[in-house]
Amino acid sequence: DCLGFMKPCDINNDKCCSSYVCGRNNHWCKFHL
């Protein structure tokens, strides 16, 4: 299972879905640019 858009995430254990990345500042899954 992966975390969707705007879901809280852990920067050290990024479980965001493939299109997303864990934000370093707010620790939410956001679009990977």
Curated annotation (Swiss-Prot):
Annotated domain remarks: The presence of a 'disulfide through disulfide knot' structurally defines this protein as a knottin.
Signal peptide extent: none
Functional description taken from the UniProt entry: Gating-modifier toxin that inhibits both sodium (Nav) and calcium (Cav3) channels by inducing hyperpolarizing shift in voltage-dependence of activation and steady state inactivation. Inhibits Nav1.1/SCN1A, Nav1.2/SCN2A, Nav1.6/SCN6A, Nav1.7/SCN9A and Cav3.1/CACNA1G sodium and calcium channels at nanomolar concentrations (IC(50)=169-621 nM). Surprisingly, selectively slows fast inactivation of Nav1.3/SCN3A. Also shows moderate inhibition of Nav1.3/SCN3A sodium channels (IC(50)=1216 nM).
MF annotations from Gene Ontology: calcium channel regulator activity; ion channel inhibitor activity; sodium channel regulator activity; toxin activity
Annotated Gene Ontology cellular component terms: extracellular region
Entry superkingdom: Eukaryota
Similarity-based family: Belongs to the neurotoxin 10 (Hwtx-1) family. 59 (Tltx) subfamily.
Pfam families: Toxin_12
Subcellular location: Secreted
Descriptive protein name: Mu/omega-theraphotoxin-Tap2a
Primary location: secreted
Additional record remark: Negative results: shows no or weak activity on Nav1.4/SCN4A and Nav1.5/SCN5A sodium channels, as well as on Cav3.2/CACNA1H and Cav3.3/CACNA1I calcium channels.
Disulfide bonds: C2-C17, C9-C22, C16-C29
InterPro entries for this protein: Huwentoxin-1
Keywords: Calcium channel impairing toxin, Disulfide bond, Ion channel impairing toxin, Knottin, Neurotoxin, Secreted, Toxin, Voltage-gated calcium channel impairing toxin, Voltage-gated sodium channel impairing toxin
SUPFAM superfamilies: omega toxin-like
Tissue: Expressed by the venom gland.
Organism, scientific name: Theraphosa apophysis (Goliath pinkfoot tarantula)
Recorded coiled-coil stretches: none
